[in-house]
Amino acid sequence: MRKTLLLIFTALSLLTCNAQEQGSADIIPMPNKLEVTAGRVLRLGSEVKISIPKDLNKRKAIVGYLEGRLSDNNIRTKSTTAKKAQLLLVVDNTLQDEAYELTVTPKRAVIKSNSQGAGFFYGVQSFMQLVPADADADAAVQCVEIKDAPRFQYRGAMIDVARNFQSKQTVLRFIDLMAAFKMNRLHIHLTDDQGWRIEIKRYPRLTEVGSKRSQTMIGHSDYYYPRRFDGKPQEGFYTQQDIKEMVAYAADRFITIIPEIEMPGHSSAALAAYPQYSCGLGKQYVVRDYMDIFDEVYCPQEQTFEFLQNVLTEVMDLFPSEYIHIGGDECPKKAWKVCPRCQALIKKLNLKDEHELQSWFVHRIERFVNSKGKSIIGWDEILEGGLAPNATVMSWRGEVGGIEAAKMKHKVIMTPGDYCYIDHYQEDPEHAPLAIGSYLPLDSVYAYNPLPESLTPEEQKYIIGTQANLWGEYVQTADYLEYMAYPRLMAMAEVQWTDAEKKDVNDFHKRLKTQFAWLDKKGVHACRNFYEAEFGGAWNNAQNVYEVKLKTLCPDAEIRYALDCADESRFKTYSAPIALDKETELWAAVYVDGKRMGGITHKRFAVNKATGCEYTCSPKAAWENMHEGYALTDGLRGFSKDTRYWTGFNKDTLQIDISLHEATTISRVKLGTLWRTWNSMWPAREVRVMVSDDGNEYRTVACKKPEYDFSLTEATRFPVEVKFEESGARFVRLVVLGGGKCHDGHYNAGEPSELALDEIEIY
């Protein structure tokens, strides 16, 4: 008989069944084989004892973790014999690494896994998710039988502490939250242009100089002109002792920390400390205080490689990870093109160009890392010029790089921005806290499948996993870090763990509703738009009306709303699409059992005679971010901090022909034109309005040359309104002249500008 520690329950609760007792097991990520015994539960009392095998890897850590989780519900733990235990851990070495089995009956819970330990840890996570978050020493645990193992071996999340430093305690809490959802790789982006965050004893100036900057940019780098800064010095780094503590803490939760030391680009902070490792562009190197791609890169000379190898040696001594991430992305070649040493090296090595020089650089670093028994990961740019022989590719610019690498039989971690970049907005950017841009809501993360259909089953084996990336340009606090990460990391955890055919987004929403109670109990500052109303407006051709539909991700919830009124007491229950015939602002909120669960959301719809109308543009739009083909008549105005509702044109003269729903009389045309000088977007300098009865013969009814206040220092949506005498029209033509050349004293002065319009409104 195995010698074990024990766990028994000394008191039984007589409470009535909760939601999970009634046939529900709301576990995230969804186990790959789950059977629920409806109506049967294991009741927990105020004291529990567990039996854990003595030969189990990380036995002490697992015991301590389980005790901590149970204590959150005021449940004490105490050991006893295996025969008496009601939570029993049993070694079964026929199970693969990370696999586990969990059986819960009215008498006991049994977790089986092999002695490696990870499976037991994951079984504990599933068991604890069956314990209601609000149970207080009276928990009723749903009876289940689970046989489970992960879909992917690499289940990662990345945090960027270089742009904005996060404390050791913040990282430890992030590790705890990852562990709760069975993630096993934490990639920490430690160095970049804006900061160096790890102590290297041989090179103390890396932290003395490289971890500090005088200030930080306010807002997006392309929003204010000139850029604005907060004037507040920022600094911070992890000592080697901090790193050891984080690595050990993560290891106890079966998470491996992968460090990233950026090279050859994104190196401003390092070169500010040690400029001798640059190409010597004849300028002062500084730790950057705004976000961009900078020309400061490492110069591929012998002293640089000695420096990098010494740095990597200290890093590898601190991190037992099998991988070292070396970055390799967004490396400008300007410095190398004008550097005599680089050009001589290209010639000496018989390289084609600077791209092959970067490949040679990465090859050389890889040989050194391999000599230490480790492998490199690099962003997909390391494919350019030839891939290093043993490198693992992290594919972020879509899946193309990952597909190419897999076909070459290289390991791949899929992390395309469209599904995995959780620094993007997750709720309506018009009202959301500042993010880098784009839009990645919860369900888009959940929809991701990391195995491209273009790969054969054999090639798909090289896709070892996927990762969510949380870049830190705008993540200045621990609370905001959690807001950006959750609940999207929970969706990613299910992508990583659960077989694709077993995923169900509606069921995920149901389980997330349960697990949100645990997030709330832990004080996680998660995004609450799961509990908020979303607006979708569109023209209904069949009904010849503009309709707004409201929805929420939260199951079994009530949506209440009002028109042009933020007073919650006047909200009424939403039951059908809302027809609008004029400009209206909708306000709405989500309620569960009569209690409002999230914030009150609102959206303005600029419904007018052009809304929903078909139109053509000559030339065609260069880009559309929303509602392709009808973005100019979708009823939604743009706003200045994001280009989500804008349409861009790169020609100076634009003709837009609009077919109205019917012949009517009109007297006004309105549109918005965007000024973002950093993006070379300048507002329309002339708008001509023409009308027609047949779509062939047009007559001009008005022409306006707007005046703008270019003394403003921030991106601005300029409204343009053209008024004229009431005229009959079935078709309307707008001839819009762009902003011409970018003005003197501004970015790209003298170069052609771009025109961006949001909504054409006709009254």
Could you describe each region identified by the protein language model?
Residues 700-710:
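Solvent-exposed serine/threonine-rich low-complexity stretches and specific carbohydrate-binding patches
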Residues 288-289, 294-389, 396-404:
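Active-site neighborhood of glycoside hydrolase catalytic domains
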Residues 376-391, 397-547:
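Flexible, acidic glycine-rich loops studded with aromatic residues
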Residues 95-323, 364, 368, 467-472:
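Feature activates predominantly on carbohydrate-active enzymes
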Residues 51, 499, 503-658, 665, ...:
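Short, compositionally stereotyped local motifs that mark structural "simplifiers"
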Residues 639-702, 716-763:
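Aromatic, loop-rich ligand-recognition surfaces of beta-strand-rich domains
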